[in-house]
Amino acid sequence: MATAALLRGATPGRGGPVWRWRLRAAPRCRLAHSSCSPGGDPTAGAAWACFRLDGRTLLRVRGPDAAPFLLGLLTNELPLPSPAAAGAPPAARAGYAHFLNVQGRTLYDVILYGLQEHSEVSGFLLECDSSVQGALQKHLALYRIRRKVTVEPHPELRVWAVLPSSPEACGAASLQERAGAAAILIRDPRTARMGWRLLTQDEGPALVPGGRLGDLWDYHQHRYLQGVPEGVRDLPPGVALPLESNLAFMNGVSFTKGCYIGQELTARTHHMGVIRKRLFPVRFLDPLPTSGITPGATVLTASGQTVGKFRAGQGNVGLALLWSEKIKGPLHIRASEGAQVALAASVPDWWPTVSK
């Protein structure tokens, strides 16, 4: 199999269009965009921002036992390649999931890309935080035992995020393929607000009409405003709980699949039906101290009651693990210099109504 298969055409799939693979060369052209909504594309003529995510990397998992092997470790079903028309290769699919430890706490968050390696054998690319690629590879090796599975880094492809230049258009704008040299272009499986994921050997802006190189700062600002955790800063290994981290909201857990490592606590919490704390997006209302806000800093109400803890952020936005019933009043953090920094928590409008 070629190290980077090429796009052929779009087919409808769960979560948006997906792209079929082919293995012979194609002329390098751009991808067109059009509206998904009846009212027309609100971003018509607007540029797409392409963010190169050097903090994300890929592991390749393949072999006859790859699917059952991963099913026993992940919180979600696998994104198996979609059925395709006669004579055409199956379409790639993406999914989101966490690896948990035996206590049921998150170790690593991953976006999975399901590929057809060859006849009736599926392979997977696991997108993970670059800083824990080696640790994740060792975690997989620990449980591999005698299964016919290979796990190896896949540096041939780079990870890009693609967003409309107008952030409010994320749920409406779409991309359509004409021809291209990208391996995978697919909607982010976590939420439509996070746009598209692009895995390619080429530069992302070269594949998108009006594409421009985005500032990574803007990507993380957008991500935090949408309440989407990503990587070990937002989801500390062995600390974060999957449902408190909104894994269910981001399509990252199945409560009907078979057993997996760490399932017991997650299933019990789900069936109790009450999740009292969640990761919420927060915005700081006061200037930040020069040293910034320390991860784990206590969030307090005006009366000094503890509401939760700051998790991570960038600039004046971030994520905090807060008691859901206490987020509406004035909140603040006592910074290391002794200053009191006001902040406000919000509920993303893409969350299920029942959670608001």
Curated annotation (Swiss-Prot):
Result after altering residue 259 to A: Abolishes the formation of the [2Fe-2S] ISCA2-IBA57 complex formation
Transit peptide: 1-39
Summary of the tissues where the protein is detected: Expressed in skin fibroblasts and skeletal muscle (at protein level).
Annotated consequence of substituting residue 146 to A: Abolishes interaction with ISCA2
Keyword list, A-Z: Acetylation, Disease variant, Heme biosynthesis, Hereditary spastic paraplegia, Mitochondrion, Neurodegeneration, Primary mitochondrial disease, Transit peptide
GO MF entries: RNA binding; transferase activity
A GO term from the CC aspect: mitochondrion
InterPro entries to which the protein is assigned, alphabetical: TrmE/GcvT_dom1, YgfZ/GcvT, YgfZ/GcvT_CS
Subcellular location: Mitochondrion
Assembly and interaction partners: Monomer. Heterotetramer; forms a dimer of dimers with ISCA2. Interacts with [2Fe-2S]-ISCA2 forming the heterodimer [2Fe- 2S]-ISCA2-IBA57 complex; [2Fe-2S] cluster binding is absolutely required to promote the complex formation.
NCBIfam families reported for this sequence: ygfZ_signature
Connected disease: Multiple mitochondrial dysfunctions syndrome 3: A severe disorder of systemic energy metabolism, resulting in weakness, respiratory failure, lack of neurologic development, lactic acidosis, hyperglycinemia and early death. Some patients show failure to thrive, pulmonary hypertension, hypotonia and irritability. Biochemical features include severe combined deficiency of the 2-oxoacid dehydrogenases, defective lipoic acid synthesis and reduction in activity of mitochondrial respiratory chain complexes. Spastic paraplegia 74, autosomal recessive: A form of spastic paraplegia, a neurodegenerative disorder characterized by a slow, gradual, progressive weakness and spasticity of the lower limbs. Rate of progression and the severity of symptoms are quite variable. Initial symptoms may include difficulty with balance, weakness and stiffness in the legs, muscle spasms, and dragging the toes when walking. In some forms of the disorder, bladder symptoms (such as incontinence) may appear, or the weakness and stiffness may spread to other parts of the body.
Name of the protein described by the UniProt record: Iron-sulfur cluster assembly factor IBA57, mitochondrial
Organism whose genome encodes this protein: Homo sapiens (Human)
